[in-house]
Amino acid sequence: MSSREIRIATRKSALALWQAEYVKARLEQAHPGLKVSLVPMVSRGDKLLDSPLSKIGGKGLFVKELETALLENEADIAVHSMKDVPMDFPEGLGLFCICEREDPRDAFVSNTYASLDALPLGSIVGTSSLRRQAQLLTRRPDLQIRFLRGNVNTRLAKLDAGEYDAIILAAAGLIRLGFEDRITSAISVEDSLPAGGQGAVGIECRTADSDIHALLKPLDHHDTEVRVTAERALNKHLNGGCQVPIACYAVLEGENLWLRGLVGDPEGGNLLTAEVRGPQCDATALGIQVAQALLDKGAGAILQKVYGEAGPQ
Protein backbone atom coordinates (compact mmCIF):
# COMPACT_ATOMS: atom_id res chain seq x y z
CA MET A 1 0.00 0.00 0.00
CA SER A 2 2.85 2.39 0.79
CA SER A 3 4.05 2.35 -2.83
CA ARG A 4 0.81 3.65 -4.35
CA GLU A 5 -0.07 7.26 -5.02
CA ILE A 6 -3.26 9.01 -3.93
CA ARG A 7 -4.39 11.80 -6.25
CA ILE A 8 -6.53 14.51 -4.61
CA ALA A 9 -9.01 16.43 -6.77
CA THR A 10 -9.40 19.98 -5.47
CA ARG A 11 -10.62 23.38 -6.57
CA LYS A 12 -7.93 25.99 -7.17
CA SER A 13 -9.08 28.58 -4.63
CA ALA A 14 -6.71 29.30 -1.75
CA LEU A 15 -9.11 27.79 0.78
CA ALA A 16 -9.71 24.64 -1.28
CA LEU A 17 -5.97 24.18 -1.74
CA TRP A 18 -5.44 24.64 2.01
CA GLN A 19 -8.00 21.91 2.68
CA ALA A 20 -6.40 19.58 0.13
CA GLU A 21 -2.92 20.21 1.56
CA TYR A 22 -4.31 19.52 5.04
CA VAL A 23 -5.68 16.15 3.90
CA LYS A 24 -2.41 15.41 2.08
CA ALA A 25 -0.37 16.10 5.23
CA ARG A 26 -2.71 14.01 7.40
CA LEU A 27 -2.52 11.07 4.98
CA GLU A 28 1.27 11.24 4.78
CA GLN A 29 1.49 11.44 8.55
CA ALA A 30 -0.82 8.46 9.03
CA HIS A 31 0.79 6.37 6.29
CA PRO A 32 4.58 6.94 6.00
CA GLY A 33 5.76 6.23 2.46
CA LEU A 34 2.38 6.98 0.86
CA LYS A 35 2.68 9.35 -2.10
CA VAL A 36 0.00 12.02 -2.29
CA SER A 37 -0.43 14.60 -5.06
CA LEU A 38 -2.97 17.32 -5.87
CA VAL A 39 -5.05 17.59 -9.04
CA PRO A 40 -6.30 21.22 -9.03
CA MET A 41 -9.29 22.12 -11.20
CA VAL A 42 -11.86 24.88 -11.71
CA SER A 43 -15.52 24.28 -10.85
CA ARG A 44 -18.58 25.87 -12.46
CA GLY A 45 -19.16 27.82 -9.27
CA ASP A 46 -15.67 29.31 -9.56
CA LYS A 47 -16.34 30.52 -13.11
CA LEU A 48 -19.74 32.17 -12.52
CA LEU A 49 -18.65 34.99 -10.25
CA ASP A 50 -20.89 37.72 -11.65
CA SER A 51 -24.13 36.25 -10.28
CA PRO A 52 -25.35 35.33 -6.80
CA LEU A 53 -25.29 31.58 -6.19
CA SER A 54 -29.02 31.71 -5.53
CA LYS A 55 -29.64 33.01 -9.07
CA ILE A 56 -27.46 30.42 -10.82
CA GLY A 57 -29.54 27.50 -9.60
CA GLY A 58 -28.52 23.88 -9.51
CA LYS A 59 -26.70 21.82 -6.93
CA GLY A 60 -23.08 20.77 -6.81
CA LEU A 61 -21.75 24.01 -8.29
CA PHE A 62 -18.42 23.48 -6.52
CA VAL A 63 -18.12 19.69 -6.70
CA LYS A 64 -19.34 18.38 -10.08
CA GLU A 65 -16.02 18.72 -11.90
CA LEU A 66 -14.21 17.00 -9.03
CA GLU A 67 -16.71 14.14 -9.12
CA THR A 68 -16.18 13.77 -12.86
CA ALA A 69 -12.44 13.43 -12.21
CA LEU A 70 -13.17 10.60 -9.76
CA LEU A 71 -15.51 8.81 -12.16
CA GLU A 72 -12.98 9.09 -15.00
CA ASN A 73 -10.13 7.89 -12.76
CA GLU A 74 -8.23 11.16 -13.04
CA ALA A 75 -8.19 11.40 -9.22
CA ASP A 76 -8.69 9.02 -6.30
CA ILE A 77 -10.31 11.28 -3.71
CA ALA A 78 -11.94 14.72 -3.75
CA VAL A 79 -11.74 17.16 -0.85
CA HIS A 80 -14.73 19.44 -0.25
CA SER A 81 -16.08 22.03 2.16
CA MET A 82 -18.99 20.06 3.60
CA LYS A 83 -21.40 22.96 3.23
CA ASP A 84 -20.90 22.74 -0.57
CA VAL A 85 -21.54 18.99 -0.87
CA PRO A 86 -24.92 17.96 -2.33
CA MET A 87 -27.03 15.48 -0.37
CA ASP A 88 -26.90 12.81 -3.07
CA PHE A 89 -23.88 11.41 -4.90
CA PRO A 90 -23.45 10.09 -8.44
CA GLU A 91 -23.60 6.31 -8.74
CA GLY A 92 -20.24 4.84 -7.78
CA LEU A 93 -19.23 7.71 -5.48
CA GLY A 94 -19.78 8.42 -1.80
CA LEU A 95 -18.62 10.36 1.25
CA PHE A 96 -16.18 8.26 3.25
CA CYS A 97 -14.56 10.67 5.68
CA ILE A 98 -15.39 13.88 7.55
CA CYS A 99 -12.46 15.60 9.25
CA GLU A 100 -12.61 17.47 12.55
CA ARG A 101 -14.65 20.65 12.37
CA GLU A 102 -13.13 24.12 12.63
CA ASP A 103 -15.10 27.03 14.16
CA PRO A 104 -18.55 26.75 12.49
CA ARG A 105 -19.65 30.33 13.19
CA ASP A 106 -20.08 33.22 10.81
CA ALA A 107 -17.59 36.06 11.20
CA PHE A 108 -18.34 39.79 11.18
CA VAL A 109 -15.53 41.61 9.37
CA SER A 110 -15.27 45.40 9.33
CA ASN A 111 -12.53 48.00 9.36
CA THR A 112 -14.73 50.53 11.15
CA TYR A 113 -17.37 48.88 13.33
CA ALA A 114 -16.90 46.41 16.20
CA SER A 115 -19.99 44.28 15.67
CA LEU A 116 -23.24 43.87 13.81
CA ASP A 117 -25.06 45.86 16.49
CA ALA A 118 -22.59 48.73 16.09
CA LEU A 119 -23.43 49.27 12.41
CA PRO A 120 -25.23 52.58 11.75
CA LEU A 121 -28.68 52.57 10.16
CA GLY A 122 -28.60 51.72 6.47
CA SER A 123 -25.08 50.27 6.49
CA ILE A 124 -23.98 48.20 3.49
CA VAL A 125 -23.18 44.58 4.33
CA GLY A 126 -21.71 42.12 1.85
CA THR A 127 -22.65 38.44 1.74
CA SER A 128 -23.30 35.83 -0.93
CA SER A 129 -25.58 33.76 1.30
CA LEU A 130 -29.38 33.85 1.43
CA ARG A 131 -29.13 32.08 4.79
CA ARG A 132 -27.09 34.94 6.25
CA GLN A 133 -29.24 37.54 4.50
CA ALA A 134 -32.47 36.14 5.97
CA GLN A 135 -31.08 36.22 9.50
CA LEU A 136 -29.37 39.61 9.12
CA LEU A 137 -32.46 41.36 7.76
CA THR A 138 -34.71 39.86 10.41
CA ARG A 139 -32.41 41.23 13.10
CA ARG A 140 -31.54 44.48 11.29
CA PRO A 141 -34.12 45.29 8.57
CA ASP A 142 -32.46 48.66 7.99
CA LEU A 143 -29.30 47.12 6.53
CA GLN A 144 -28.54 47.12 2.81
CA ILE A 145 -27.41 43.62 1.80
CA ARG A 146 -25.12 43.70 -1.23
CA PHE A 147 -24.00 40.77 -3.37
CA LEU A 148 -20.46 39.53 -2.57
CA ARG A 149 -18.73 36.69 -4.42
CA GLY A 150 -15.12 35.65 -5.02
CA ASN A 151 -12.45 33.99 -2.91
CA VAL A 152 -11.58 35.15 0.59
CA ASN A 153 -8.81 37.50 -0.57
CA THR A 154 -11.11 39.10 -3.15
CA ARG A 155 -13.86 39.66 -0.61
CA LEU A 156 -11.49 41.22 1.91
CA ALA A 157 -10.06 43.46 -0.83
CA LYS A 158 -13.55 44.70 -1.70
CA LEU A 159 -14.16 45.56 1.95
CA ASP A 160 -10.81 47.34 2.16
CA ALA A 161 -11.67 49.31 -1.00
CA GLY A 162 -14.69 50.76 0.79
CA GLU A 163 -17.40 48.94 -1.16
CA TYR A 164 -18.98 47.69 2.08
CA ASP A 165 -19.24 48.80 5.70
CA ALA A 166 -18.89 45.16 6.74
CA ILE A 167 -18.88 41.68 5.24
CA ILE A 168 -19.92 38.31 6.66
CA LEU A 169 -17.69 35.29 6.01
CA ALA A 170 -17.29 31.81 7.46
CA ALA A 171 -14.90 32.01 10.41
CA ALA A 172 -13.33 28.67 9.44
CA GLY A 173 -12.07 29.93 6.10
CA LEU A 174 -10.48 33.02 7.63
CA ILE A 175 -8.80 30.97 10.36
CA ARG A 176 -7.45 28.37 7.94
CA LEU A 177 -5.97 30.98 5.61
CA GLY A 178 -4.27 32.87 8.43
CA PHE A 179 -6.73 35.78 8.46
CA GLU A 180 -7.99 35.23 12.00
CA ASP A 181 -6.94 38.78 12.87
CA ARG A 182 -9.45 40.07 10.30
CA ILE A 183 -12.36 38.65 12.32
CA THR A 184 -13.75 41.73 14.06
CA SER A 185 -16.19 39.59 16.02
CA ALA A 186 -17.56 36.08 15.77
CA ILE A 187 -21.34 35.97 15.42
CA SER A 188 -22.92 33.56 17.89
CA VAL A 189 -24.92 30.65 16.49
CA GLU A 190 -27.93 32.13 18.28
CA ASP A 191 -27.65 35.25 16.12
CA SER A 192 -26.61 33.53 12.88
CA LEU A 193 -27.24 29.80 12.71
CA PRO A 194 -24.59 28.28 10.40
CA ALA A 195 -25.04 26.32 7.19
CA GLY A 196 -25.15 22.55 7.50
CA GLY A 197 -21.60 21.22 7.57
CA GLN A 198 -20.02 24.67 7.87
CA GLY A 199 -16.41 24.42 9.05
CA ALA A 200 -16.06 20.72 8.23
CA VAL A 201 -14.01 19.13 5.44
CA GLY A 202 -15.30 15.99 3.70
CA ILE A 203 -13.58 13.44 1.49
CA GLU A 204 -15.41 11.78 -1.40
CA CYS A 205 -14.14 8.75 -3.30
CA ARG A 206 -15.25 5.76 -5.35
CA THR A 207 -17.42 3.32 -3.41
CA ALA A 208 -15.47 0.35 -4.80
CA ASP A 209 -12.07 1.57 -3.53
CA SER A 210 -12.06 -0.21 -0.17
CA ASP A 211 -8.28 0.18 0.11
CA ILE A 212 -8.66 3.97 -0.02
CA HIS A 213 -11.50 3.85 2.50
CA ALA A 214 -9.07 2.17 4.90
CA LEU A 215 -6.42 4.85 4.29
CA LEU A 216 -8.95 7.58 5.11
CA LYS A 217 -10.06 6.01 8.39
CA PRO A 218 -7.48 7.81 10.62
CA LEU A 219 -8.70 11.19 9.31
CA ASP A 220 -12.35 10.60 10.21
CA HIS A 221 -13.59 12.52 13.27
CA HIS A 222 -16.52 10.70 14.87
CA ASP A 223 -18.12 13.62 16.71
CA THR A 224 -18.00 15.85 13.63
CA GLU A 225 -19.40 13.05 11.48
CA VAL A 226 -22.39 12.55 13.80
CA ARG A 227 -23.15 16.28 13.93
CA VAL A 228 -22.83 16.78 10.18
CA THR A 229 -24.91 13.65 9.50
CA ALA A 230 -27.83 15.20 11.41
CA GLU A 231 -27.41 18.54 9.64
CA ARG A 232 -27.28 16.92 6.20
CA ALA A 233 -30.35 14.79 6.93
CA LEU A 234 -32.27 17.99 7.69
CA ASN A 235 -31.00 19.61 4.50
CA LYS A 236 -31.86 16.58 2.38
CA HIS A 237 -35.43 16.39 3.72
CA LEU A 238 -35.87 20.05 2.75
CA ASN A 239 -34.29 19.45 -0.67
CA GLY A 240 -31.66 22.00 0.31
CA GLY A 241 -28.46 23.03 -1.43
CA CYS A 242 -25.64 25.40 -0.56
CA GLN A 243 -27.52 28.43 -1.94
CA VAL A 244 -30.84 28.37 -0.09
CA PRO A 245 -31.90 30.05 3.20
CA ILE A 246 -31.60 26.91 5.33
CA ALA A 247 -29.49 26.82 8.49
CA CYS A 248 -28.83 23.95 10.86
CA TYR A 249 -26.38 23.24 13.63
CA ALA A 250 -25.89 20.18 15.83
CA VAL A 251 -23.92 19.84 19.05
CA LEU A 252 -23.29 16.75 21.16
CA GLU A 253 -24.36 16.63 24.80
CA GLY A 254 -22.91 13.42 26.15
CA GLU A 255 -24.70 10.60 24.33
CA ASN A 256 -27.35 13.00 23.05
CA LEU A 257 -27.46 15.37 20.11
CA TRP A 258 -29.08 18.81 20.05
CA LEU A 259 -30.06 19.95 16.57
CA ARG A 260 -31.38 23.38 15.70
CA GLY A 261 -32.81 24.19 12.27
CA LEU A 262 -34.00 27.34 10.53
CA VAL A 263 -35.59 28.40 7.26
CA GLY A 264 -35.86 32.12 6.58
CA ASP A 265 -37.33 34.47 4.03
CA PRO A 266 -34.36 36.19 2.33
CA GLU A 267 -36.28 39.48 2.56
CA GLY A 268 -36.20 39.19 6.36
CA GLY A 269 -38.92 39.22 8.98
CA ASN A 270 -39.93 35.57 8.75
CA LEU A 271 -37.61 33.07 10.42
CA LEU A 272 -39.00 29.61 11.09
CA THR A 273 -37.12 27.61 13.72
CA ALA A 274 -37.29 24.14 15.22
CA GLU A 275 -35.05 22.02 17.41
CA VAL A 276 -34.81 18.57 18.93
CA ARG A 277 -32.72 16.62 21.41
CA GLY A 278 -32.26 12.87 21.16
CA PRO A 279 -29.75 10.00 21.07
CA GLN A 280 -26.81 10.79 18.80
CA CYS A 281 -27.14 7.31 17.29
CA ASP A 282 -30.40 8.60 15.76
CA ALA A 283 -28.69 11.54 14.02
CA THR A 284 -30.38 11.00 10.65
CA ALA A 285 -33.85 10.57 12.16
CA LEU A 286 -33.37 13.70 14.29
CA GLY A 287 -32.44 15.69 11.19
CA ILE A 288 -35.57 14.53 9.41
CA GLN A 289 -37.67 15.32 12.49
CA VAL A 290 -36.49 18.94 12.62
CA ALA A 291 -36.93 19.34 8.86
CA GLN A 292 -40.49 18.05 9.08
CA ALA A 293 -41.22 20.42 11.96
CA LEU A 294 -40.03 23.30 9.77
CA LEU A 295 -42.21 22.12 6.89
CA ASP A 296 -45.18 21.92 9.25
CA LYS A 297 -44.56 25.58 10.11
CA GLY A 298 -44.61 26.65 6.45
CA ALA A 299 -40.99 26.31 5.31
CA GLY A 300 -42.10 24.76 2.03
CA ALA A 301 -43.64 28.01 0.80
CA ILE A 302 -40.48 30.01 1.56
CA LEU A 303 -38.24 27.48 -0.16
CA GLN A 304 -40.53 27.11 -3.16
CA LYS A 305 -40.37 30.86 -3.69
CA VAL A 306 -36.56 30.76 -3.57
CA TYR A 307 -36.34 27.74 -5.89
CA GLY A 308 -38.68 29.45 -8.31
CA GLU A 309 -36.45 32.52 -8.45
CA ALA A 310 -33.28 30.44 -8.79
CA GLY A 311 -34.48 28.21 -11.60
CA PRO A 312 -34.34 24.41 -11.69
CA GLN A 313 -32.54 22.74 -8.81
Curated annotation (Swiss-Prot):
Modified residues (S-(dipyrrolylmethanemethyl)cysteine): C242
Keyword tags: Porphyrin biosynthesis, Transferase
Annotated cofactor note: Binds 1 dipyrromethane group covalently.
PROSITE patterns: PORPHOBILINOGEN_DEAM
GO cellular component: cytoplasm
Catalytic reaction annotation: 4 porphobilinogen + H2O = hydroxymethylbilane + 4 NH4(+)
An annotated Gene Ontology molecular function: hydroxymethylbilane synthase activity
Domain of life: Bacteria
EC number annotated for this UniProt entry: 2.5.1.61
One Pfam family per UniProt: Porphobil_deam
Cofactor list: dipyrromethane
Major enzyme class: transferase
InterPro entries: HemC (IPR000860), Porphobilin_deaminase_cofac_BS (IPR022419), Porphobilin_deaminase_N (IPR022417), Porphobilinogen_deaminase_C (IPR022418), Porphobilinogen_deaminase_C_sf (IPR036803)
GO biological process: protoporphyrinogen IX biosynthetic process
Presence of keyword Transport: no
UniProt key word Transferase: yes
Pathway the protein takes part in: Porphyrin-containing compound metabolism; protoporphyrin-IX biosynthesis; coproporphyrinogen-III from 5-aminolevulinate: step 2/4
Protein function: Tetrapolymerization of the monopyrrole PBG into the hydroxymethylbilane pre-uroporphyrinogen in several discrete steps.
UniProt cross-references to PANTHER family, sorted A to Z: PORPHOBILINOGEN DEAMINASE
Known partners and oligomeric status: Monomer.
Other facts noted in the record for this chain: The porphobilinogen subunits are added to the dipyrromethane group.
Family: Belongs to the HMBS family.
The name this protein goes by in its record: Porphobilinogen deaminase
Protein species of origin: Pseudomonas fluorescens (strain SBW25)
Gene from which the chain derives: hemC
